[in-house]
UniProtKB/Swiss-Prot annotation:
GO molecular function per UniProt: signaling receptor binding
Principal localisation: membrane
Cellular component terms per the entry's GO annotation: external side of plasma membrane
Disruption phenotype: Mice mount mildy augmented T-helper 1 responses and display slightly lowered parasitic burdens upon Leishmania major infection.
Domain of life of the organism encoding this protein: Eukaryota
Protein's job: Negatively regulates T-cell-mediated immune response by inhibiting T-cell activation, proliferation, cytokine production and development of cytotoxicity. When expressed on the cell surface of tumor macrophages, plays an important role, together with regulatory T-cells (Treg), in the suppression of tumor-associated antigen-specific T-cell immunity. Involved in promoting epithelial cell transformation.
GO biological process: adaptive immune response; negative regulation of apoptotic process; negative regulation of T cell activation; negative regulation of T cell proliferation; positive regulation of interleukin-2 production; positive regulation of T cell proliferation; response to protozoan
Residues with attached carbohydrate: 216
Signal peptide: 1-24
PROSITE patterns: IG_LIKE
Lipidation (GPI-anchor amidated glycine): 257
Gene name of this polypeptide: Vtcn1
Provenance organism: Mus musculus
Post-translational modification: N-glycosylated.
Name by which UniProt lists this protein: V-set domain containing T-cell activation inhibitor 1
Length: 283
């Protein structure tokens, strides 16, 4: 039979073991709670020569001075951009991004780590990482950024042609797109034999102007000019009647995600109505 001293001794040992386990669990939960935070990237294509956005969000943290945002690009030594202690730190920025990047500093505390990229270049395409560290923990997410050129087409009646024809023009595309015509009346018809498409290189020797002419068109019919490459798809519609001409155009960025990014414009009887609805696509 164990003595009173032995009972007390083993009781103390058991209490120590239980307390140690509890402390380990508390520390473990504390570390895990601070170690990982959710970082989400959104992706869309960059239009060469224009400004673009690499979108990234994270769990908000009101402690601005404790937030670190780093943008990195695969294959590039140094950083694309860094924001810490409430301001930009560009001491390690790669030279190809100098003077071209900025974060939305006033939105960092609400979880916006998106990067504004000025004057998008063809070489900006690639895999980027959005790395975040806050007082709550750290996390990162990747996104694929495509670059090219895309623009909305405009369709007009070509009164200079020998027969009724339509002229579809789009000022900037890259890579070279495909062009196809469609008709509401003649659905499924192949218009390749009654259309002519040309590509004219622009002055910067990268993007190209797209011109396509459709011949032998009929009145009271709606025609569509569709321009598409691996980045974007644009459609221009036109309906010519005896009394008026109605036009509509739409540009859709082709990226994986639940919501497409769509720009659209409608022109009815000479009056223009412009609407823009752009939804960033969740990667």
């Amino acid at each position: 039979m164990a003595s009173l001293g032995q009972i007390i001794f083993w009781s103390i040992i058991n209490i120590i073991i239980i307390l140690a386990g509890a402390i380990a669990l508390i520390i473990g939960f504390g570390i895990s709670g601070k170690h990982f935070i959710t970082v989400t990237t959104f992706t869309s294509a960059g239009n060469i020569g224009e400004d673009g956005t690499l979108s990234c969000t994270f769990e908000p943290d009101i402690k601005l001075n404790g937030i670190v945002i780093q943008w990195l690009k695969e294959g590039i030594k140094g950083l694309v951009h860094e924001f810490k202690e409430g301001k930009d730190d560009l001491s390690q920025q790669h030279e190809m991004f100098r003077g071209r990047t900025a974060v939305f500093a006033d939105q960092v505390v609400v979880g916006n780590a998106s990067l504004r990229l000025k004057n998008v270049q063809l070489t900006d395409a690639g895999t980027y990482t959005c790395y975040i560290r806050t007082s709550k923990g750290k996390g990162n997410a990747n996104l694929e950024y495509k670059t090219g050129a895309f623009s909305m087409p405009e369709i007009n009646v070509d009164y200079n042609a020998s027969s009724e024809s339509l002229r579809c023009e789009a000022p900037r595309w890259f890579p070279q797109p495909t062009v196809a015509w469609a008709s509401q009346v003649d659905q499924g018809a192949n218009f390749s034999e009654v259309s002519n498409t040309s590509f004219e290189l622009n002055s910067e020797n990268v993007t190209m102007k797209v011109v396509s002419v459709l011949y032998n068109v009929t009145i009271n019919n709606t025609y569509s000019c569709m321009i598409e490459n691996d980045i974007a798809k644009a459609t221009g519609d036109i309906k010519v009647t005896d009394s008026e001409v109605k036009r509509r155009s739409q540009l859709q960025l082709l990226n994986s995600g639940p919501s497409p990014c769509v720009f659209s414009s409608a022109f009815v009887a000479g009056w223009a109505l412009l609407s823009l609805s752009c939804c960033l696509m969740l990667r």
